[in-house]
Amino acid sequence: MRVDLNCDLGEAFGNYSFGGDHQIIPLITSANVACGFHAGDENVMNETVKLAKAHNVAVGAHPGLPDLKGFGRRNIDISNDEIYNLMIYQLGALQGFCRIHQVKINHVKPHGALYQMGAKDREIASVIAQAVYDFDPSLVLVGLANSYLISEAKNVGLITASEVFADRRYEDDGQLVSRKESDAVITDTDEALKQVLKMVKENKVISKNNKEVTLQADTICVHGDGEHALLFVSKIREILMKEGIDIQSL
């Protein structure tokens, strides 16, 4: 049994610095690097790619909506053409830094509202998948398990990775509980570890209404901006190794 452990990183920009990227990267197998629209800038992107390479961590693009103020977590009324173009733009930006450090972009995971829009809307998911395929058909598209991001990526011929979350609660339909709700984020370490093991070993998660939901767990996400990110990543890695589960990049 194997699983990938990923984290959204490189989300500082300018004078705004947060997250424990230097401590987290050695513990994960895949880094989703912000590409400048929701967070990150040219200096942070360069440093994050360099750091990932130093620790043999797979580099992935983490493109988001153009919303620095809202950290890319607010829905924006945006056309399909704009979605396609912002995907290509951000992938190109990251590719530049990957090229100078002689590493390859391994995967793409949309961020925040863009991720949720793609998970719930087949047409948006199709646009996202097509953009990734047109940029590089060898890339892995990471999306919410059982969502349109996964099905539409498969439809265009992309390799997919179904993502599950250690630090988020689930609805009965397998969607994530909205961050607008007070119970959306898991902050208790034991609860997070219990959820992770059930998802990885049984391909199931218990929803907020105590319903058992079936899902595929190819990669586990911990949000890098979360208060408990470093602790969660450390403990998840520890318990997976204890259970004999291989932690490997996508």
From Swiss-Prot:
Pfam family name, one: LamB_YcsF
Entry keyword annotation includes RNA-binding: no
Bridged cysteine pairs (disulfide): none
EC number: 3.5.2.9
Signal peptide: none
Family matches, as InterPro entries: Glyco_hydro/deAcase_b/a-brl, LamB/YcsF/PxpA-like
GO molecular function: 5-oxoprolinase (ATP-hydrolyzing) activity; ATP binding
Keywords: ATP-binding, Hydrolase, Nucleotide-binding
Superkingdom in the source lineage: Bacteria
Catalytic activity entry: 5-oxo-L-proline + ATP + 2 H2O = L-glutamate + ADP + phosphate + H(+)
CDD domains: LamB_YcsF_like
Description of how the protein assembles with itself and partners: Forms a complex composed of PxpA, PxpB and PxpC.
Purpose of the protein: Catalyzes the cleavage of 5-oxoproline to form L-glutamate coupled to the hydrolysis of ATP to ADP and inorganic phosphate.
Name of the featured protein: 5-oxoprolinase subunit A
Gene name for this UniProt entry: pxpA
